[in-house]
């Protein structure tokens, strides 16, 4: 059974969904996404987990109170805890993809008592790289375009330079409605297209500048596994996952698909995630 609700956070109302039965599992989405990004994944996992998905502040149905401001990671973690609190949960398993993976790392570092285990899929954390300069140069150009040509030009460069997305597909992502037949995928893509400006102005740079406290995670002993996509085309993302895993002394598990596999192939992705969560989950914590 699917239930929906809203919880008040600090300066925001957070929309969230709950489905399934079993150990609680919080799915954290990355930049521009919303709860619908995980609909397929959550549905495939709901037979074994109580799955929570939500819209992060400023995205889709999670409205801000006051002026928008650059993303603050501690605030993102507090929002995730607000969803757990509203659901009556002391702790949960956590999965995050992309920017949501960075939030999962922050939760494990900052709030270890609330995280039973975390699976971290391709976090964009260039701070862990031995030479992050070439990767950061892409984001310096995004900043320049944002200041001189506007958010759409900056977003277009981001999609092309980081995701390798062709120009015609970027144009569709900015205005997907006329190009897609009615249905859940169209509804999702129309919703998230309205998040692109907020992501470009307030989230991208903050995610890239985030420095995960890997020493804190090592010290507190939260079970963490990194994940990378077998089909991921950006070698820097793969390297970030591998380096983060090595510094944590954690596994780096190969998942099917690429960076957006949780949306594109949820069934195959869920199968690997389910097995990994079962291995990571501390015994006796259900």
Please report, for each region that a protein language model flagged, where it lies by residue.
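Conserved HGGG/HGGXW glycine-rich cap/lid loop of the alpha/beta-hydrolase fold
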Residues: 5-64, 69
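Glycine-rich His-Gly loop
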Residues: 27-31, 98, 229
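Active-site loop/oxyanion-hole signature of alpha/beta-hydrolase fold enzymes
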Residues: 52, 56-93
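Short beta-to-alpha linker loops that shape the active-site pocket of alpha/beta-hydrolase fold enzymes
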Residues: 55-59, 124, 256-258
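Short, amphipathic alpha-helical "lid/cap" segments that border enzyme active or binding sites
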Residues: 77, 81, 155, 266-274
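Conserved hydrolase catalytic core segment
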Residues: 90-130
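Alpha/beta-hydrolase
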Residues: 134, 138-141, 145-243, 247-251
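Catalytic active-site module of serine/aspartate enzymes centered on a nucleophile-bearing elbow/loop
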Residues: 246-286
């Amino acid at each position: 059974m699917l239930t929906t609700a809203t919880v008040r956070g600090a300066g925001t109302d957070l929309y969230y969904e709950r489905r399934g039965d079993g150990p609680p599992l919080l799915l954290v989405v990355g930049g521009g996404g919303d709860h619908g990004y995980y609909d397929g994944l959550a549905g495939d996992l709901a037979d074994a987990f109580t799955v929570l998905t939500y819209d992060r502040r400023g995205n889709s149905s999670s409205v801000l109170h006051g002026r928008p401001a650059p993303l603050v990671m501690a605030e993102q973690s507090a929002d995730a805890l607000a969803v757990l609190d509203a659901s009556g949960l002391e702790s949960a398993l956590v999965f995050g993809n992309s920017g949501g993976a960075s939030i999962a790392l922050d939760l494990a570092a900052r709030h270890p008592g609330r995280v039973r285990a975390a699976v971290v899929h391709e976090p964009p954390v260039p701070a862990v790289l031995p030479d992050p300069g070439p990767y950061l140069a892409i984001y310096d150009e995004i900043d320049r375009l944002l200041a001189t040509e506007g958010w759409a030009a900056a977003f277009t460069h981001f999609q092309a330079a980081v995701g390798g997305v062709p120009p015609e597909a970027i144009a569709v992502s900015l205005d997907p409605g006329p190009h897609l037949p009615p249905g859940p995928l169209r509804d999702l893509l129309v919703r998230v297209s309205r998040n692109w400006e907020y992501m470009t102005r307030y989230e991208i740079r903050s995610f890239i500048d985030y420095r995960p406290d890997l020493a804190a995670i090592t010290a507190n002993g939260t079970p963490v596994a990194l994940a990378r996509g077998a089909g991921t085309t950006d070698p820097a993302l793969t390297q970030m996952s591998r380096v983060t895993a090595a510094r944590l002394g954690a596994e780096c598990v190969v998942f099917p698909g690429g960076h957006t596999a949780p949306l594109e192939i949820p069934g195959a992705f869920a199968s690997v995630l389910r097995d990994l969560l079962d291995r990571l989950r501390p015994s006796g914590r259900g």
